[in-house]
């Protein structure tokens, strides 16, 4: 049965759900209009300064970014949508291939209702086999295959988008965990100063205004803590939505490979970036459509067979009462003139190809800009980290001096409160700076198409689709 079916219908390709990156990336990008991509780094060092980037000790329940990304891509509905579209497009290839196979049709008709033949019924069966068409069917198949490659590239784009969304959420969640910890320390520190101010005011050592001022600072720090906790909970809820379970008791880990495998000091491979692959696939679709339009000018040769049986009346094919007739013939057909539509379609296809090529260049330019922005961010954040660490030491020493001077009465409680705030402000800036570096790195990983390598998604079945490097 399977062998017989293969004679009359095309065999579907069951490998559409395996994305071959070598095949998708088998093209060159013309970057002559732009400068070369920058290699991020400084002339003095070939390593990223990760001082101060150590994480909280893991607890009994720890998840890292790679594990979270794998969970998210397995359940994200937009990836499901793209994969369903991929399967649909694979079926469209079979639709195009069907033109290679015999086309059977049949029906029953009556005679001319305005003549004496109106009582005739004619049963007919027709078979048509395309013999030669100058490659028109092949061009239709090529269009559908190019669209399949485009759909595969769009699946990769969506996987990278989800991976970036998860990684960015984890980085920001870790950021606000640290910021909330520092904000709580600030509340505790100011509360201690307020307690001391109350004791001194009650003892008559200092002004009664000191406790009021301390209370104002305490309330401001408490308000800041609530604001930071709100941001933390927002990212917790975002991750909960992406992963599908409560993540409040999970300790998130940012693995070192986010830094080491981001290849921040290496030029990216442009033709392996999903957005570039998608744009190039659109070029291939436009080229195939142009080829199909050009071939539509040529004739098609078909082998046509017919069977007809008059059920009542005369068979018009042989003029016999209740007659049976059969015939086999060659038939050549061509569209000679359609009001200039073929020429217009050819021009439209040419413009579509140029537009698709421009989209490749635009995608490259966007990537170029993003990488250069990341270069500046990472370079300056590393320089800023050194200043912030020095400031942290200075503010700590300042607070110690102000405490001694406050005891001696040469400093006001406001000076002491400002010193306390300065310490925690410096600590917050260090943490924000640290996680800004991480945020830029995960953005770079996505921009340069390295998400599948860094988060170990290659050769992993993602909702039935496997990415093969």
Task: Please describe what each predicted stretch is.
Residues 125-127, 330:
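Membrane-embedded beta-strands of outer-membrane beta-barrel proteins
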């Amino acid at each position: 049965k399977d062998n017989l079916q293969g004679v009359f219908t095309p065999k579907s390709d069951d490998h559409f759900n395996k994305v071959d990156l070598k095949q998708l990336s088998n093209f060159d990008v013309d970057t002559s209009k732009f400068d070369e991509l920058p290699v991020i780094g400084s002339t003095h060092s070939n390593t990223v300064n990760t001082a101060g980037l150590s994480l909280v000790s893991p607890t009994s329940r720890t998840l890292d970014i790679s594990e979270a990304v794998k969970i998210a891509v397995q359940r994200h509905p937009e990836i499901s949508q793209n994969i369903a579209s991929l399967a649909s497009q694979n079926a469209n290839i079979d639709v195009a291939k069907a033109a290679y196979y015999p086309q059977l049709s049949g029906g029953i008709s009556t005679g001319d209702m305005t003549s004496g033949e109106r009582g005739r019924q004619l049963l007919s069966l027709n078979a048509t086999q395309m013999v030669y068409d100058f490659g028109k069917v092949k061009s239709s198949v090529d269009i559908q295959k190019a669209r399949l490659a485009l759909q595969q590239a769009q699946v990769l784009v969506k996987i990278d988008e989800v991976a970036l969304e998860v990684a960015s959420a984890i980085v920001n969640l870790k950021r606000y965990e640290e910021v909330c910890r520092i904000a709580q320390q600030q509340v505790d520190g100011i509360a201690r100063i307020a307690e001391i101010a109350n004791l001194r005011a009650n003892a008559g050592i200092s002004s009664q205004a000191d406790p009021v001022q301390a209370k104002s600072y305490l309330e401001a720090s408490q308000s800041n803590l609530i604001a930071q906790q709100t941001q933390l909970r927002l990212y917790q809820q975002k991750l909960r939505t992406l992963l599908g379970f409560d993540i409040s008791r999970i300790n998130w880990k940012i693995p070192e490979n986010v830094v080491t495998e981001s290849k921040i000091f290496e030029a990216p491979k442009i033709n392996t970036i999903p957005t570039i692959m998608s744009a190039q696939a659109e070029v291939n679709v436009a080229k195939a459509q142009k080829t199909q339009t050009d071939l539509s000018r040529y004739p098609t040769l078909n082998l046509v067979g017919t069977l007809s049986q008059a059920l009542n009346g005369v068979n018009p094919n042989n003029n016999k009462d209740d007659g049976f007739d059969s015939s086999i013939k060659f038939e050549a057909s061509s569209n000679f003139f359609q009001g200039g539509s073929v020429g217009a379609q050819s021009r439209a296809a040419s413009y579509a190809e140029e537009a698709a090529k421009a989209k490749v260049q635009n995608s490259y330019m966007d990537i170029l800009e993003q990488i250069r922005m990341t270069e500046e961010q990472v370079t300056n954040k590393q320089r800023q980290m050194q200043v912030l660490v020095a400031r942290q030491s200075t503010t700590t020493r300042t607070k110690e001096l102000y405490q001694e001077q406050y005891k001696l009465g040469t400093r006001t409680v406001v000076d002491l409160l400002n010193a306390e705030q300065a310490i925690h402000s410096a600590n917050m800036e260090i943490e924000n700076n640290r996680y800004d570096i991480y945020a830029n790195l995960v953005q770079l990983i996505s921009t340069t198409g390295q998400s599948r390598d860094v988060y170990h998604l290659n050769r992993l079945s993602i909702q039935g689709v496997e990415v093969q490097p």
